[in-house]
UniProtKB/Swiss-Prot annotation:
GO CC aspect terms: cytoplasm; nucleus; transcription regulator complex
Principal location: nucleus
DNA-binding region of this protein: 38-106
Record localization: Nucleus; Cytoplasm
Tissue expression from the record: At the shield stage, expressed uniformly in the future ectoderm. At the 75-80% epiboly stage, becomes localized to the presumptive neuroectoderm; strong expression in the presumptive forebrain, weak expression in the presumptive spinal cord. At the tail bud to 3-somite stage, expressed in distinct regions of the future brain, the anterior margin of the neural plate and the future retina. At the 12-somite stage, strong expression in the central nervous system rostral to the hindbrain, including the optic vesicle.
Name of this protein: Transcription factor Sox-2
Length: 315
């Protein structure tokens, strides 16, 4: 638009274009230099800004052409109609002269190339969202056939929650350890009565995991997961892994182990009473669950007893 501001309609001699060199590209220069191209007649603003642009460019040689155009546009809007009148008349004269010289002229604007949409430019990585579905719903309620997808989404959730991938990997390895040998025969008798309710209720694990983060007690969730059936869905297994990794074993002395064991026993009995039908099974199940929690919290921690186990003399 500003290619014609610095030159007259018919310049007597070629003059260097001082103000309009910044807003033309190579294709614009080729079309400008071609003799077949017919320029559009200048409007009133272009007639007025032709002298003002040259003056402002001389006063501010380092100012960019776009900034000059912004300032000239603001000044043109502030002019009154009486001040604009001579430039409007000059633009009408130039338009009439242009129509006389080029009667067959028709303005053909150049078509702009289509740019990519923002949603096409900035797409999410391939593993975070399922194609055509909700990523959170797919990550929580997965079935048994989506093992690789669960691991990938768990890694992404680990970064979101502030936990490193190493913590999840260590807890997944601990899930593969065999159970304590003294508990195998004792737990087989209680395996079936424990799971008379539906296992699909664990699919709301996002809310329970957040409560487990706040409470900081992974003993119930781990003992519950170890007594579950082998046909457990991977979504619930992922929730157990997250709840276990949310709290590390506490670094305490041997004297405080007995107090912690008593508190855990009381909490376990309160939790077990919500699920077990009779009171005669509470003591046995509490002992077995406490054994399991001690087995999975038995990682060597500095400052604890041998293997980090809690003495059972208080039971």
């Amino acid at each position: 638009m500003y290619n014609m501001m610095e030159t007259e309609l018919k310049p007597p001699a070629p003059q260097p274009n001082t103000g309009g060199t910044g807003n033309t590209n190579s294709s614009g220069n080729n079309q400008k230099n071609s003799p077949d191209r017919i320029k559009r007649p200048m409007n009133a603003f272009m007639v007025w800004s032709r002298g003002q642009r040259r003056k402002m460019a001389q006063e501010n040689p380092k100012m960019h052409n776009s900034e000059i155009s912004k300032r000239l546009g603001a000044e043109w809007k502030l002019l009154s109609e009486s001040e604009k009148r001579p430039f409007i008349d000059e633009a009408k004269r130039l338009r009439a002269l242009h129509m006389k010289e080029h009667p067959d002229y028709k303005y053909r604007p150049r078509r702009k190339t289509k740019t990519l949409m923002k949603k096409d430019k900035y797409t999410l990585p391939g593993g975070l969202l399922a194609p055509g579905g909700n990523g959170m719903g797919a990550g929580v309620g997965v079935g048994a056939g989506l093992g690789a997808g669960v691991n990938q989404r768990m890694d992404s959730y680990a970064h979101m929650n502030g936990w490193t991938n190493g913590g999840y990997g260590m807890m997944q390895e601990q899930l593969g350890y065999p159970q304590h040998p003294s508990l195998n025969a004792h737990n087989t008798a209680q395996m079936q009565p424990m799971h008379r309710y539906d296992m699909s209720a664990l699919q709301y694990n996002s809310m329970t995991n957040s409560q487990t983060y706040m409470n900081g007690s992974p003993t119930y969730s781990m003992s519950y997961s170890q007594q579950s059936t082998p046909g457990m869905t991977l979504g619930s297994m992922g929730s157990v892994v997250k709840s276990e990794s949310s709290s590390s074993p506490p670094v305490v002395t041997s004297s405080s182990h007995s107090r912690a064991g008593q508190c855990q026993t009381g909490d376990l009995r309160d939790m077990i009473s919500m699920y077990l039908p009779g009171a005669e099974v509470q003591d046995q199940s509490a002992q077995s669950r406490l054994h399991m929690s001690q087995h999975y919290q038995s990682a060597p921690v500095p400052g604890t007893t041998i293997n980090g186990t809690i003495p059972l003399s208080h039971m």
